[in-house]
């Protein structure tokens, strides 16, 4: 079974809570919560208040918080207090990586690092033993509905091999253009977690879409 983390950026915001409950009831083990600052990426999404509201309504859910922001260090505590289970930030951010990892862990959250399509996975090497998750972006971050980049598969394979070599325990997540066609390729390459937005919330039957992905 594959872990499915539906990207709620693609949900219907007029019924966000109901959409989240629907995918959780269908078997999604996480909710992928994209935070964008309009600086690190050109788009702006949601922040601490929306997460706090979701957590209030669904306190048992796993909130996979993806910080597509230039300065994640300043938000380690606010997002932890709002209900983040895991805070996942970009290797390409402007803050000190080690300091940010330490700050997130100090708040009691799991920690992940993300790499954009132009970043080699080897750049993560100094931090892999400290991580709970590594996210490989298979599109340029910032907007949903982009086409999957096949080069991400080789990154997943390298990270899977490096994890085995180190006997590390981080999970491998892939995000961007994940659908019924690309998801099996990602799982074969080593992905433990599939982030899917349009493929879930844009499907005629989102619950069935979650179940299909989870069955891979």
Regions found by a protein language model. Name each.
Residues 1-88, 94-96, 103-106, 110-111, ...:
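Conserved N-terminal beta1-alpha1 strand-loop-helix module at the mouth
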Residues 3, 114, 135-138, 173, ...:
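Conserved beta-strand segments that form the floor/walls of ligand-binding pockets within enzyme
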Residues 35, 91, 115-117, 138-139, ...:
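Short secondary-structure boundary segments
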Residues 140, 147-193:
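Active-site/ligand-binding-proximal alpha/beta "capping" segment
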């Amino acid at each position: 079974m594959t872990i499915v983390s539906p990207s709620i950026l693609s949900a219907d915001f007029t019924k966000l809570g109901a959409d989240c409950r629907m995918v959780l009831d269908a078997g999604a083990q996480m909710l992928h919560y994209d935070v964008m600052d309009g600086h690190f990426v050109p788009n702006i999404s949601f922040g601490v208040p929306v997460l706090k509201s979701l957590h209030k309504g669904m306190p048992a859910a796993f909130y996979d918080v993806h910080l597509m922001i230039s300065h994640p260090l300043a938000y380690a505590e606010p997002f932890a207090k709002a209900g983040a289970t895991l805070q996942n930030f970009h290797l390409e951010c402007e803050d000190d990586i080690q300091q940010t990892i330490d700050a997130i862990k100090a708040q009691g959250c799991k920690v992940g690092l993300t790499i954009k399509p132009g970043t080699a996975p080897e750049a993560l090497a100094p931090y892999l033993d400290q991580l709970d998750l590594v996210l490989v972006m298979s599109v340029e971050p910032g907007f949903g509905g982009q086409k999957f980049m096949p080069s991400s598969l080789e990154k997943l394979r390298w990270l899977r091999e490096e994890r085995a070599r180190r006997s590390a325990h981080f999970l491998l997540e892939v995000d961007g253009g994940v659908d019924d066609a690309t998801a099996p390729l990602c799982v074969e390459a080593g992905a433990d977690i599939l982030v899917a937005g349009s493929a879930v919330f844009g499907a005629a039957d989102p619950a069935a879409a979650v179940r299909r992905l989870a069955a891979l």
